């Protein structure tokens, strides 16, 4: 059996590290879902302002999701993932230091919005990697695994870990820890 055809319960073993990277990266990206809106309000912003930050992030992510496949086809999925990873890390730091750290709403929107453009470049370019490396008759299970590791990262670990970290290192410490997870997933 060739290396490209080896699977475990439909998981393409030749892409195992990519799947793990998605799970770890999305864990870090998902930390904020559990508390960021409340934290923004605790900085003195209104519920409407906190909601608008998430709306802007969602719009940026939707736009980036739309173009990520095209970009991956033009410059390769690996380069697209690298660009998304670097942008996410840089703009996460800027968001923490100058947006949240200074309670500057304009910079919060700018940096969080640009960060919203970044994660789909990293995340959805991996779908192109799957398509390029998995036989078409095996793609359904390979994509099922993709969505499973994505969901475990963002929805399970990313939402659960802050329940342990916030009492010990606070919201900002937890957001800095998110960077460590994304660095581990992106490298």
Labelled PLM ranges:
Residues 58-66, 155-156:
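Residue-level signature of mid-helix packing/kink "hotspots" within the transmembrane helices
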Residues 64-76, 166:
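Helix-to-loop junctions at the C-terminal end of transmembrane segments
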Residues 23, 105-121:
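Hydrophobic core of transmembrane alpha-helices in multi-pass small-molecule transporters
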Residues 173-187:
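Symmetry-related core transmembrane helices of the 12-TM Major Facilitator Superfamily/SLC fold
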Residues 86-102:
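C-terminal ends and interior cores of transmembrane alpha-helices
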Residues 121-134:
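Intracellular juxtamembrane helix-capping segments at the cytosolic ends
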Residues 8-58:
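Helix-loop boundary and gating motifs at the non-cytosolic
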């Amino acid at each position: 059996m060739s290396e490209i055809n080896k699977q475990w319960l439909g998981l393409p073993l030749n892409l195992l590290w990519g799947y793990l990277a998605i799970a770890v990266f999305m864990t870090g990206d998902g930390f904020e879902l559990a508390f960021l809106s409340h934290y923004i309000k605790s900085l003195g912003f209104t519920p409407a302002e906190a909601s608008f930050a998430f709306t802007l992030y969602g719009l940026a992510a939707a736009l980036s999701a739309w173009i990520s496949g095209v970009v991956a086809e033009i410059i390769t999925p690996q380069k697209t993932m690298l660009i998304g990873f670097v942008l996410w890390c840089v703009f996460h730091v800027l968001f923490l230091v100058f947006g949240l750290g200074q309670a500057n709403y304009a910079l919060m929107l700018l940096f969080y919005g640009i960060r919203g453009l970044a994660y789909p470049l990293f995340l959805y370019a991996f779908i192109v990697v799957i398509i390029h490396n998995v036989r078409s008759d095996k793609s359904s299970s390979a994509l099922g695994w993709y969505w499973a590791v994505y969901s475990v990262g963002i929805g399970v670990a990313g939402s659960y870990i802050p329940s342990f970290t916030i009492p010990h290192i606070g919201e900002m410490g937890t957001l800095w820890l998110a960077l460590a997870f994304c660095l581990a997933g992106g490298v």
